[in-house]
Amino acid sequence: MRRIFILTLPLLLILACNLPTDPPPTLTIETLRAQATAFPTLTPQSDLQPATATSTTSPADGPTGKIVYTCQVTGNQLCIINADGTGFRQLTSDPVRHWYASLAPDGSSVVYSAYVADNVFEIFEMDLTSGVGKQLTDNLGVLIAPEISPDGQSITFTRGDANGASQIWVMDRNGANPQKIHGQGWDPTWSPDGTQILFASNMEGSNQLFVVNRNGSNARRVTDFDALRGRSDWSPDGAWMVTYNGPAWNREVFIFRPDFSDLRQLTPAGGNSQGPSFSPDGKWVTFTSYFDHYGDDLGCEIYIIRVDGTDLRRLTDNAYCDYQPRWGP
């Protein structure tokens, strides 16, 4: 069975490695370059009701910005593409494995984690104009999932230790002054105003999402899922959150309010969808799914969907895995 490279922290796995026992529902999905048509409403494999597909596509209301992701062209490299399907660019092409890239608030650079040696992950920032990457950390631990704050001054990230435990940290944009702000968590993302951080943790037993203040105070639980994984995002206006939940090969993206109200399944059932990220205008969500290659470990592609659950589009179509997308300007 073909497999992708995985991280050493078990809680931070974004892709499943066990194959399904039953085939998924058959879906017809348009590519991003195709003329859009309404996407049919499907019955989810959940008690929750998915958003219904009723809106129509308007060219003026199409996706904008860029999406950066891990592409397994050769190993785990970084790629970027415009949200309208143009401008594909491979950012890295070296033996180092790269993961968890995200765009700076102004879209000028990406930060990411690189596996530079056995159990050594460092955080880098690459300028998108020059293509030059700069190492920001040095032997701080297993560092993954970096994200730059909305004001561009700080970076939050996950730090793992040799025992597999993970923590939420924050440092200056240049890598100075790293500080632990929470002792048990992973996959952090900033609130739109930069005063809070959303992250996953099992501090109360099961995996759930929590919010903590920038200074590490007032950690509080947000969700009540049964099989949450971790990767999440906060909408630009602060009104919504997204994450993914479910057992292996049956994961779905869910959208909800910061108080966990108005919960609904966003993705159609049967794709094993995960790793969501909002568009800069808050109208779309990108995610990884296996709709077209269900059951194949290397069958993951990048998709986008409107926040009302309509207009599902495939952004990539490759013989290798594309995953961990993050949307930026």
Q: Where do the model's predicted regions map?
A:
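Sequence signature of WD/YWTD-type beta-propeller architectures
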Residues: 2-4, 17-329
